[in-house]
């Protein structure tokens, strides 16, 4: 039986139903490229994840071969597809008030400081972390203009768009108190029931921007009283981790805090930081 579809449509259908081959050589090239561009180290067991995420890019571009896709990337170092490639391979697991023990430490530190208290969320993902920081500072310091500011960044431009929107499912805010939910969020009605949006009064204190932590210099409005860089260093090798931590040093004020993820340990990487608490590091006053 012959197909009644035009040949072009038949080709597209075949792409959608057939599993494309990802050779060892192509997987190694992908690992090299994402390491060069974003510093991310992909282990062999991530191969299925890489396939499932990048095959969507191939199909969106009408390509049926990973080699052609990689050659297209390498042929134009300024192609917009590079950002799509990075977005596809970054992992964004986050939640409001994740690793909750950090936030009372942040609040206490903020109350003891003078002037505008500034925080950088260096892996902001879809916004849950920077908004959790903002809620903590609003509760601790109030909402007077110029009292505090949160700068939030990520390499993934797609998650930053969601973060800027400030829209979340109500079910994602279970870690907030009823008072915080009422004070800092608006509930959706009608077709938007079950959704909430960050109130503009809080959102005004949070600034979002795209930053690649591999850059030699960060275009960020430091220095900061605290930096949150949680659950992102685990994707980098030790050399890259050390380089990033050294770039953080001049961006922190004396006795500034660095918050790390639960599985990250920076104690033996950079001598300027000393352990202050559970996954919390302080910049030595004489090293700033």
UniProtKB/Swiss-Prot annotation:
Top-rank taxon: Bacteria
**Any one GO molecular function term:** protein methyltransferase activity
GO cellular component, alphabetical, reads: methyl accepting chemotaxis protein complex
Q: SUPFAM superfamilies under this entry?
A: Chemotaxis receptor methyltransferase CheR, N-terminal domain, S-adenosyl-L-methionine-dependent methyltransferases
The biological processes this protein is annotated with in GO are: chemotaxis; methylation
Q: Give the keywords, sorted.
A: Chemotaxis, Methyltransferase, S-adenosyl-L-methionine, Transferase
Residues annotated to bind S-adenosyl-L-methionine: 92, 94, 98, 129, 154, 212-213, 230-231
Q: What is its EC number?
A: 2.1.1.80
Name all CheR-type methyltransferase domain ranges: 15-286
The record's catalysed reaction(s) read: L-glutamyl-[protein] + S-adenosyl-L-methionine = [protein]-L-glutamate 5-O-methyl ester + S-adenosyl-L-homocysteine
Write one Pfam family the protein is assigned to: CheR
Q: Which CDD domains match?
A: AdoMet_MTases (cd02440)
PANTHER family referenced in this protein's UniProt entry, alphabetically: CHEMOTAXIS PROTEIN METHYLTRANSFERASE (PTHR24422:SF19)
Reported function = Methylation of the membrane-bound methyl-accepting chemotaxis proteins (MCP) to form gamma-glutamyl methyl ester residues in MCP.
The molecule here is called Chemotaxis protein methyltransferase
Which organism is this entry from?
Answer: Salmonella typhimurium (strain LT2 / SGSC1412 / ATCC 700720)
